[in-house]
Swiss-Prot record:
<feature type="disulfide bond" description="Redox-active">
    <location>
        <begin position="230"/>
        <end position="232"/>
    </location>
</feature>
<dbReference type="GO" id="GO:0051082">
    <property type="term" value="F:unfolded protein binding"/>
</dbReference>
<dbReference type="GO" id="GO:0044183">
    <property type="term" value="F:protein folding chaperone"/>
</dbReference>
<dbReference type="GO" id="GO:0005829">
    <property type="term" value="C:cytosol"/>
</dbReference>
<dbReference type="InterPro" id="IPR016154">
    <property type="entry name" value="Heat_shock_Hsp33_C"/>
</dbReference>
<comment type="similarity">
    <text>Belongs to the HSP33 family.</text>
</comment>
<dbReference type="GO" id="GO:0008270">
    <property type="term" value="F:zinc ion binding"/>
</dbReference>
<dbReference type="InterPro" id="IPR016153">
    <property type="entry name" value="Heat_shock_Hsp33_N"/>
</dbReference>
<dbReference type="GO" id="GO:0009408">
    <property type="term" value="P:response to heat"/>
</dbReference>
<keyword id="KW-1015">Disulfide bond</keyword>
<dbReference type="GO" id="GO:0042026">
    <property type="term" value="P:protein refolding"/>
</dbReference>
<keyword id="KW-0676">Redox-active center</keyword>
<dbReference type="InterPro" id="IPR000397">
    <property type="entry name" value="Heat_shock_Hsp33"/>
</dbReference>
<keyword id="KW-0346">Stress response</keyword>
<keyword id="KW-0862">Zinc</keyword>
<dbReference type="GO" id="GO:0006979">
    <property type="term" value="P:response to oxidative stress"/>
</dbReference>
<protein>
    <recommendedName>
        <fullName>33 kDa chaperonin</fullName>
    </recommendedName>
</protein>
Amino acid sequence: MPQHDQLHRYLFENFAVRGELVTVSETLQQILENHDYPQPVKNVLAELLVATSLLTATLKFDGDITVQLQGDGPMNLAVINGNNNQQMRGVARVQGEIPENADLKTLVGNGYVVITITPSEGERYQGVVGLEGDTLAACLEDYFMRSEQLPTRLFIRTGDVDGKPAAGGMLLQVMPAQNAQQDDFDHLATLTETIKTEELLTLPANEVLWRLYHEEEVTVYDPQDVEFKCTCSRERCADALKTLPDEEVDSILAEDGEIDMHCDYCGNHYLFNAMDIAEIRNNASPADPQVH
């Protein structure tokens, strides 16, 4: 069995092409467990998770990437956020009936993919591509060609392992400032495209790479763990409350006796009573009771 929830980087010695392979199981399950999503929505989030992991691994700096789908369809938002430590979280918003076998365009409708790159230091960058491809992978390949001018291919697979959702993917990309031959890149892409879902999700990464590229010279680097991690906190909720008009906060307190702030990503609840609100307004740090 493979070591799930790991990302592997690799490099072709005879071509100016690099690759990545990722599989996720536990991380995906944690993203899905607090929600009752229809299966097509689960599949999209699985693909987004794989894609975000692969894209985050292309960063040459500390920071994070958010990949989101937006549109006017029954799933009007799906988003995964990840950082250079491969810490991921995600959520989707459903506002209508989801057909059982809905494809990406049926789910999102008229929409687009937004990729937001936020370095720990430096300026934020945002790229937008229309949802013109039939798959998420095709849309992201289009993004790379438009924004990075780097030939890039993504191969994403979703399925189940031992009855639990899992997903995996591979990325091939021409090295920046290198003169890779198109024929060489196409050859490697053709090999990669033959990967079967079962192989990618159930075989160790090194065996997958050997099956695909055993006639090539490939250097495989140490893997990086992928994990679910939410960045919500009581302090962030308190900061958000500071931005609301006092009369709105007081109205909620008068009606409900407390304010319940819920994180859509992880399901945590943060409760604030009148005393907490008074402390927030006095710039004090409220106590940290938290309901899971």
